[in-house]
Amino acid sequence: MDFSAIDWQRPWLAHLRDLGAQLATSPDWIAAASALASERGLTNSTHLPIVFVPQDLLPTSIGYEAHIHATGQVPTRHNLHDFFNALIWLHFPATKRMLNQLQAREIHRHPSRNLRGEQRDAATLFDENAAIFVSRKPSMTTLLAQRQWNTLLLADATRFHAECQVILFGHALLEKLIQPYKSITAHVWPLHFHDLESEDRGQLSLPLLDEVVATMVAPGFVSRDFHHLPILGVPGWWQGQDEAFYADASVFRPPKMTQA
């Protein structure tokens, strides 16, 4: 497994950089991730400790999410996809626990593997491809929802970073960004900064963010609850972010037309 493909200086990895770089140097990163999970007291929704185990320990008679819910064991392969999954468990344990609980609840309701339903699909989208869009002003979220790309992203990068923060969550999204390309688009979960202020005024607390997001998703949600954001459009996250860059309608989709 080659960790050299990960450029930890990428701005979208800032919240994962310290622990991720440390874990990547371990001779057995899966065991190291389990040790960190134990130190931090990570559990699933039934209070079983989270342990990262080899993929071949997953029985053929049970699905991945159901197994995590039943045992606390997270089947893990030696690849970057599962490395990022472990890293997200370590940074966002409450949200990961809640997503797994939602999956387990839906599996119990609809045991057939051929019937997933809206909730499971939405939980999978969050788990694999979500970014959290934290804004200080509701108007910024409105611009995102309306796909007003120039006003949101191009007009004033300083204003954007003063009023917004984008935190990547989806482990498949993180894996795709190892080899970035312009059209990579996240399913965005919006929330307001005033719910997240730590004791150090104005600073975003990642553990508090985790708890707030877990509480928000707990009642359930569907894929229509997401907004969409081409990740390399975040100001400063890619080169050449000029008018032509954001005018590419195949990536930065125009606002939906509403019928009169």
Where in the sequence are the language-model features?
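N-terminal ordered "arm"
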Residues: 1-49
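Short, hydrophobic/amphipathic alpha-helical patches that form generic packing surfaces
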Residues: 10-19, 82-94, 124-128
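Long, hydrophobic/aromatic-enriched structural stretches that serve as scaffold segments
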Residues: 42-92
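Eukaryotic complex-assembly regions enriched in large gene-expression and RNA-handling proteins
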Residues: 62, 97-100, 121-123
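Short, glycine/acidic-rich hinge or "gate" loops at secondary-structure transitions
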Residues: 97-109
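A contiguous, surface-oriented mixed alpha/beta subdomain in the mid-to-C-terminal portion of proteins
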Residues: 108-260
